[in-house]
C-alpha cells in the first residue's frame, strides 16, 4: 500500500530505431493485455516484449517499441501521457477498451504491410516446459495485434507467465507460456482446440 501503480523508464535506441520501455508494477490478471492495449491506443507498435514475474508478485515488463511508421517516438509529452494512462488503467479508473475507442482511428487493427498476408497459425507445446503450456502464434502484424491476443487469452482463463514477442517483416511470431487459474497446463484436447479456434477467429 502507498506504492505507485508503476515505475516506467524509457531509453531511445537511435541506431536500432526503437525505444526500450521498462515497466515495473504489481502483477494482476490481464496485466500484459492492459499494457498492450494502452500502447495500441497511442499508436505505438510493439516489436518485442519480455515479461519477468517474481514470486513476490512484482512484474518487470521490457518492451521494444516504435511508431506505426517505424520511427522512434521521441516526444516526451507523449510518453508522459502514456504513463498517465497506464497508471489510470492499472488503478482501475479507466478501461482499456474506452481508451482505444477514444484515441484510435478507424484504421485500427488493419495490417501494416501491403503484402498478401500469410495464413495465421497457432501451435501448442506441452513438452518444452514442465510447468507451462507454450503457445506459438504466427499472425499478420498489425497495430493492436498483441492486445487482441492477450485480451483473448485472458478471456479464455489463461494466465501469461512468460512472453516472447518478435516481428519479422510483416509477420509476428509471439510465444506465450501459460497456465490455467489453478496453475496447471492446458492438456485437454477439446480445450486446446477451443483456444486455437477462438484465437484464429479473433485474428481474422
What are these model-derived regions, one by one?
Residues 1-204:
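Non-catalytic interaction/regulatory segments
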Amino acid at each position: 500500500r502507498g506504492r505507485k501503480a508503476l515505475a516506467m523508464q524509457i531509453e531511445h535506441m537511435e541506431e536500432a530505431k526503437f525505444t526500450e520501455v521498462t515497466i515495473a508494477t504489481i502483477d494482476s490478471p490481464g496485466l500484459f493485455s492492459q499494457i498492450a492495449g494502452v500502447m495500441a491506443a497511442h499508436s505505438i507498435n510493439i516489436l518485442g516484449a519480455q515479461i519477468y514475474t517474481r514470486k513476490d508478485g512484482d512484474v518487470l515488463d521490457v518492451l521494444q517499441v516504435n511508431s506505426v511508421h517505424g520511427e522512434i517516438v521521441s516526444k516526451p509529452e507523449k510518453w508522459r501521457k502514456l504513463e498517465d494512462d497506464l497508471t489510470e488503467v492499472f488503478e482501475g479508473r479507466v478501461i482499456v477498451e474506452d481508451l482505444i475507442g477514444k484515441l484510435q482511428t478507424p484504421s485500427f487493427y488493419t495490417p501494416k504491410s501491403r503484402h498478401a498476408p500469410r495464413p495465421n497459425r497457432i501451435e501448442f507445446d506441452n513438452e518444452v516446459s514442465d510447468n507451462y503450456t507454450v503457445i506459438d502464434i504466427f499472425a499478420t502484424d498489425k497495430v493492436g495485434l498483441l492486445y487482441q491476443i492477450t485480451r483473448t487469452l485472458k478471456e479464455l482463463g489463461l494466465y501469461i507467465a512468460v512472453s516472447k514477442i518478435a516481428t519479422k517483416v510483416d509477420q509476428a511470431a509471439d510465444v506465450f507460456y501459460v497456465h490455467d487459474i489453478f496453475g496447471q497446463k492446458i492438456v485437454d484436447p477439446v480445450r486446446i482446440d477451443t483456444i486455437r479456434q477462438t484465437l484464429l477467429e479473433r485474428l481474422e
